[in-house]
Amino acid sequence: MIPIPSSVRVWIATGYTDMRRGMQGLALTVQEQLKRDPHAGDLYIFRGRRGDLAKILWHDGIGLSLYAKRLDRGKFIWPSASDGAVSISAAQMAYMLEGIDWRNPQTTWRPKSAG
């Protein structure tokens, strides 16, 4: 995982996002739907309808970055609100990206082999 400074605020975009969107499309979503500045240095996490793919949009002061993570098994735990954004800590984000319920951390299934 890319080291994220502790000053960065992490936002989960609640609801579902069209995962065909790229960097510019997600930045537009942040600006129009979440009413926030995508270039302000905050980190935004989006999830698709199936729940196993998350995309992270972050402007680090130099440029805009887009990261993606797909879980081999299970789904990302997502807030139940259908509109807006929910703020979480960097530690909670790390749990989420490992497939662990960030609201109540417990380990989950891990693959034993690649094939």
Region roles according to the model:
Residues 1-115:
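Polybasic/polar functional segments that serve as interface/processing modules
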